[in-house]
């Protein structure tokens, strides 16, 4: 498991044991309650005897370093985004999942789930991460290359037909193609039978590599009109775009992000976040973030442009297929005061299970 570790040596060298302890307490209090922590309450939490005045002096130094700030006059202190990043990199202890938590995840997205359909696993993973993290669970899956099981040509008009492609897992894709003039229903059936006999069990990319070879076979076995139909169908299928790009985003637990929002401005920022998530470019961006390093990645607030307006954090990890290709990502989106140390192992273990189930 690898976390993002920017160079914070300058900040680290400026903190002694006492200031580090005070900083850690401020951040942990924020992650737990979301409220500023004042010097008087903080002095009571410290394992060493320190007056509120001495605590305030240390707080002032931490403010100068850009690690904490005061939301308003005479308030306590909250961590800045820089402070949160420094805490995650320098102070956070990533916890271990309990046996009960591992078993719960396995029941929903592992071998313990009796419904192993891709759709069910993706939905269950997103729902499970949402429930355990109190954030929004997300799963991104890349567009797969379905293996062709069956093809049928259905006439829609004298010059148009619907080509129905059925994959090995019974997924269905429909394409409208232009028919050669004068082709009969019998020839439609003949063309479909040819495709099913010669191309079943192959993916579209595999079809691309042997398109010319298939055309030669067509010319040897079919009449001219049926040949024309098969070649038109092959041209449409092999010209499909977008293979390997993120095709789907599943998000569960959006309502969790509404908790603690204050005013229409916060709600509008959240709306913009979910609008952005629905855009294909955003899916590619999230997948790229997951691919940018091994293991779990943490992005806080404006560290990523996708979350700069909403002030959200993302914890994300990729999962892989049997060829070790990244085929998707799982993660949690939430406020910057997410329980990072608890969520990181959840995301990490879920990604491991998704990789096993994708092999």
Curated annotation (Swiss-Prot):
Top-rank lineage group of the source organism: Bacteria
Family statement drawn from the similarity comment of this UniProt entry: Belongs to the HrcA family.
Role description: Negative regulator of class I heat shock genes (grpE-dnaK-dnaJ and groELS operons). Prevents heat-shock induction of these operons.
Gene expressing this chain: hrcA
Keywords (A to Z) from UniProt: Repressor, Stress response, Transcription, Transcription regulation
InterPro entries referenced in this protein's UniProt entry, alphabetically: GAF-like_dom_sf, HrcA, HrcA_C, WH-like_DNA-bd_sf, WH_DNA-bd_sf, WHTH_transcript_rep_HrcA_IDD
Biological process, per Gene Ontology: negative regulation of DNA-templated transcription
SUPFAM superfamilies according to UniProt: GAF domain-like, Winged helix' DNA-binding domain
MF-aspect GO terms: DNA binding
Species, as recorded: Sinorhizobium medicae (strain WSM419) (Ensifer medicae)
The protein's name in its UniProt record: Heat-inducible transcription repressor HrcA
Pfam families tied to this protein: HrcA
């Amino acid at each position: 498991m690898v976390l993002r570790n920017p160079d914070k040596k300058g900040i680290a060298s400026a903190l002694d044991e006492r200031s580090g302890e005070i900083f850690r307490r401020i951040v942990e209090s924020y992650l737990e309650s979301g409220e500023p922590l004042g010097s008087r309450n903080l002095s009571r939490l410290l394992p060493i005897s320190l007056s509120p005045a001495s605590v305030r002096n240390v707080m002032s130094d931490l403010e100068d370093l850009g690690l904490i700030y005061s939301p308003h006059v005479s308030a306590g202190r909250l961590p800045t985004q820089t402070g949160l990043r420094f805490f995650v990199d320098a102070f956070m202890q990533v916890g271990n999942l309990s046996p009960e938590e591992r078993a719960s995840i396995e029941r929903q997205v592992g071998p313990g789930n009796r419904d192993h359909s891709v759709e069910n696993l993706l939905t269950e993973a997103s729902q499970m991460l949402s429930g355990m993290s109190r954030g929004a669970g997300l799963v991104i899956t890349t567009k797969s290359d379905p293996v062709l099981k069956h093809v049928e040509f259905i006439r829609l008009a004298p010059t148009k037909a619907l080509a129905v492609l059925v994959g090995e897992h019974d997924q269905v894709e429909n394409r409208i193609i232009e028919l050669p003039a004068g082709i009969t229903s019998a020839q439609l059936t003949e063309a479909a039978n040819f495709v099913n006999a010669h191309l079943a069990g192959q993916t579209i990319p595999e079809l691309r590599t042997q398109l010319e070879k298939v055309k030669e076979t067509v010319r040897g076995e079919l009449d001219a009109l049926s040949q024309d139909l098969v070649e038109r169908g092959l041209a449409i299928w092999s010209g499909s775009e977008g293979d390997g790009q993120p095709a789907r985003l599943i998000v569960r637990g959006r309502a969790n992000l509404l908790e603690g929002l204050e005013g229409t401005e916060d709600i509008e920022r959240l709306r913009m976040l979910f609008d952005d998530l629905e855009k294909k470019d955003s899916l590619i961006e999230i997948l790229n973030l997951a691919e940018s390093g091994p293991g779990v990645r943490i992005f806080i607030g404006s560290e990523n442009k996708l979350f700069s307006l909403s002030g959200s954090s993302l914890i994300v990890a990729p999962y892989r297929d049997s060829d070790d290709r990244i085929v998707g990502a799982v993660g949690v989106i939430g406020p910057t005061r997410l329980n990072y140390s608890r969520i990181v192992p959840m995301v990490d273990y879920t990604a491991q299970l998704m990789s096993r189930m994708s092999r």
